[in-house]
Amino acid sequence: MARKSLIQRERKRQKLEQKYHLIRRSSKKEISKVSSLSDKWEIHGKLQSPPRNSAPIRLHRRCFSTGRSRGNYRDFGLSGHILRERFHACLLPGATRSSW
């Protein structure tokens, strides 16, 4: 189980990302439209003005069950060991155990 502070920090980042999403997207479109280098630098300065944690690259996928940030499967939203436990308990329909 991940620490609760890490999970809360991730939720805060998600809220910030949603809040500044339109500002970032519009600034990136402006950069692609402008041809002069000085104007691009000005717009790039605007792009750096939102908080650092509002960048989408700083978000992590977390396991819904445990909050683990590593080894997640996007299709299920679970980490590897929780996914395996749920496969064995037949809680995920359509999944089969691999045997070799």
From Swiss-Prot:
GO biological process: translation
Major subcellular location class: plastid
Protein name, per record: Small ribosomal subunit protein uS14c
One Pfam family of this chain: Ribosomal_S14
Example of a GO cellular component annotation carried by this entry: chloroplast
One term of GO molecular function: rRNA binding
Subunit-level organization: Part of the 30S ribosomal subunit.
Keywords carried by this UniProt record: Chloroplast, Plastid, Ribonucleoprotein, Ribosomal protein, RNA-binding, rRNA-binding
Subcellular location per the Swiss-Prot or TrEMBL entry: Plastid, Chloroplast
InterPro entries found in the cross-reference section: Ribosomal_uS14 (IPR001209), Ribosomal_uS14_bac/plastid (IPR023036), Ribosomal_uS14_CS (IPR018271)
UniProt family annotation: Belongs to the universal ribosomal protein uS14 family.
Function statement: Binds 16S rRNA, required for the assembly of 30S particles.
